[in-house]
């Protein structure tokens, strides 16, 4: 590496592979197999490319209005970003500046640790229980803030709202960020707690339930005072972070939310069926409220199953460097016919 002063050394986030093969089944990055709403496709077709000569809006007012009506909050409780990763990254800059350690789980979304390192925020990883669950009392006591994925990734396990409220009630002098990327696959949102806990900040994405991972739109929900701090950070980095096309297509998605409720139900039904089928093959399957399952094979190693699935152009996620789940595979939930093909391949591999 070239030797120059001031170069930053950091361990970056490692994303899942993005293969592009015609007959593959891609189940490694929790994308939505059903695709965007037809209204999104219509909005894309009707978009006037001449509009791209102008900068996008600063506050995404129309999208905020639609989201506010959908969620039952006011527009001043919302901020839109370039994916929920953008919102979460800004949250580290906006909320975690006390000098005390920020708390998050030892087995959760890998970006949290990366952002803490990047922004030089002290942190402490709280071990999940032996059953991969969050124990609320582990988050009591002095800290510089908390960030929890609920449901968690990569485990898929959901923390009941009552237990989440225990954490909020015990940390009212610090911001508690709840990452709800997967909340619409069976969990109960923390939205009802917003009026009681001004220290609560929720993040959401259009990548999972709205099938717009390639568009990069996410949002944060919280007390107007928290939103004001977030907007100040956003305007200090890139006030135009949400492009015009993304805003228009996200708006079309919100306006056709019944479509996503329907596809979400289909994903949940397929997930529950697939989990039962894996359990019948002696897999240990963690209870999931997401669009994926984390499962441990017992008749074959996770590494071998991962390799043999990949040879069949079936891509799942393997975490060989994560000690607690190195014997597990994370498998996204596709359409029923895709999952039947995957199940048949797993049966063939496990019986050979």
Curated annotation (Swiss-Prot):
Q: What is this protein called?
A: Histidinol-phosphate aminotransferase
Write down the chemical reaction(s) this protein catalyses: L-histidinol phosphate + 2-oxoglutarate = 3-(imidazol-4-yl)-2-oxopropyl phosphate + L-glutamate
Task: Tell me the superkingdom of the source.
Answer: Bacteria
Q: What's the family?
A: Belongs to the class-II pyridoxal-phosphate-dependent aminotransferase family. Histidinol-phosphate aminotransferase subfamily.
Query: What organism is listed for this UniProt entry?
Result: Streptococcus gordonii (strain Challis / ATCC 35105 / BCRC 15272 / CH1 / DL1 / V288)
Keywords in UniProt for this one? Amino-acid biosynthesis, Aminotransferase, Histidine biosynthesis, Pyridoxal phosphate, Transferase
A GO molecular function held by the record: pyridoxal phosphate binding
Show the CDD domains listed in the entry. AAT_like
What is this enzyme's EC? Answer: 2.6.1.9
PANTHER family (UniProt xref) = HISTIDINOL-PHOSPHATE AMINOTRANSFERASE (PTHR43643:SF3), HISTIDINOL-PHOSPHATE AMINOTRANSFERASE 2 (PTHR43643)
Gene3D superfamilies registered for this protein in UniProt: Aspartate Aminotransferase, domain 1, Type I PLP-dependent aspartate aminotransferase-like (Major domain)
N6-(pyridoxal phosphate)lysine occurs at which residues? 208
> Which pathway does the protein contribute to?
Amino-acid biosynthesis; L-histidine biosynthesis; L-histidine from 5-phospho-alpha-D-ribose 1-diphosphate: step 7/9
Which leading EC class covers this enzyme? Answer: transferase
State the disulfide connectivity. Answer: none
């Amino acid at each position: 590496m070239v030797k120059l002063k001031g170069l930053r050394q950091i361990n970056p986030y490692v994303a899942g592979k993005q293969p592009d093969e015609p007959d593959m089944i891609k189940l490694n990055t929790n994308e939505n197999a059903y695709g965007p709403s037809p209204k999104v496709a219509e909005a894309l077709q009707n978009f006037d490319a001449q509009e791209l000569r102008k900068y996008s809006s600063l506050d995404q007012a129309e999208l905020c209005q639609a989201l506010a009506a959908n969620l039952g909050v006011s527009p001043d409780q919302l901020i839109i970003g370039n994916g929920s990763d953008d919102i979460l990254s800004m949250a580290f800059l906006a909320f975690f500046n006390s000098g005390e350690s920020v708390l998050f789980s030892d087995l959760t979304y890998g970006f949290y640790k990366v952002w803490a390192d990047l922004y030089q925020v002290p942190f402490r990883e709280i071990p999940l229980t032996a059953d991969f669950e969050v124990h609320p009392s582990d988050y009591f006591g002095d800290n510089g803030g908390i960030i929890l994925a609920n449901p968690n990734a990569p485990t898929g396990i959901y923390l009941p709202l009552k237990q989440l409220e225990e954490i909020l009630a015990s940390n009212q002098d610090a911001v508690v960020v709840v990452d709800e990327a997967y909340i619409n696959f069976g969990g109960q949102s923390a939205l009802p707690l917003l009026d009681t806990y001004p220290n609560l900040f929720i993040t959401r994405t259009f990548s999972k339930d709205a099938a717009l991972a390639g568009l990069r739109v996410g949002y944060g929900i919280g007390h107007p005072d928290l939103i004001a701090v977030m907007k100040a950070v956003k305007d200090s980095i890139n006030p135009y972070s949400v492009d015009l096309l993304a805003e228009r297509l996200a708006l079309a998605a919100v306006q056709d939310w019944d479509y996503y409720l329907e596809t979400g139900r289909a994903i949940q039904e397929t997930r529950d069926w697939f989990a039962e089928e894996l359990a019948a093959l002696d897999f240990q399957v963690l209870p999931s409220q997401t669009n994926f399952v984390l499962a441990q094979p017992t008749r074959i190693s996770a590494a071998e199953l991962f390799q043999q699935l990949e040879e069949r152009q079936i891509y799942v996620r393997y975490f060989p460097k994560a000690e607690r789940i190195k014997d597990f595979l994370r498998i996204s939930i596709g359409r029923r016919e895709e999952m039947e093909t995957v199940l048949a391949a797993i049966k063939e591999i496990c019986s050979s």
